[in-house]
Amino acid sequence: MAALSAPGLRSFWILGLRSSVGTAVQAQGVHQSVATDGPSSTQPALPKARAVAPKPSSRGEYVVAKLDDLINWARRSSLWPMTFGLACCAVEMMHMAAPRYDMDRFGVVFRASPRQSDVMIVAGTLTNKMAPALRKVYDQMPEPRYVVSMGSCANGGGYYHYSYSVVRGCDRIVPVDIYIPGCPPTAEALLYGILQLQRKIKRERRLQIWYRR
């Protein structure tokens, strides 16, 4: 019986070896086809490249970038708004200047002269007769200058949107940087708008744009 079973075991072992070799060859062919044809689900996923900020290409560009950061820090830390109260929103603007909110701690100080201001807060309803005065005051402000539209009336006319004597948004007269919704918006909303303006100034790259020209 042992003599009869030995050839059977040998043939079974040979068949198993052939099947394993065939499987290995088939797997190698699959990997080769994947490598030649393109990516597939059988390949392990490659790690994604991390988002890295581009480094300055030269020493001059690096110096200009750091100088830009310094100037932006100085600008956003000393915003001097021009008081341009037109309606009830100006009461909330004055509320922000009161000791409860104390906007001076953010470097925001009201100025009465447009030549000493770099921010204009349009608070209230802008009429057609007041529009030329608004533009004239804006032109007298030194560069860079920013405009904050406070309230629904300044944003788009608000309650008086269909009136014949009201401008439907002060952005038709001057370019606006920050819009503050509300009728009227609270002092907290105005303070939040000022903080958003500071964040916008922080992202400016005026010197870098000038340097790359």
Swiss-Prot record:
It comes from the Eukaryota. Residues 33-53 are annotated as: Disordered. Coiled coil: none annotated. The modification Hydroxyarginine is found at residue 111. One of its GO terms (molecular function) is monooxygenase activity. It catalyses: a ubiquinone + NADH + 5 H(+)(in) = a ubiquinol + NAD(+) + 4 H(+)(out). Residues 33-44 have a biased composition (Polar residues). InterPro entries: NADH_UbQ_OxRdtase-like_20kDa, NADH_UQ_OxRdtase_20Kd_su. The keyword DNA repair does not apply. Its EC number is 7.1.1.2. It is found in: Mitochondrion inner membrane. Belongs to the complex I 20 kDa subunit family. GO terms for cellular component: mitochondrial inner membrane; respiratory chain complex I. This is NADH dehydrogenase [ubiquinone] iron-sulfur protein 7, mitochondrial. Core subunit of respiratory chain NADH dehydrogenase (Complex I) which is composed of 45 different subunits. This is a component of the iron-sulfur (IP) fragment of the enzyme. It is a peripheral membrane protein.
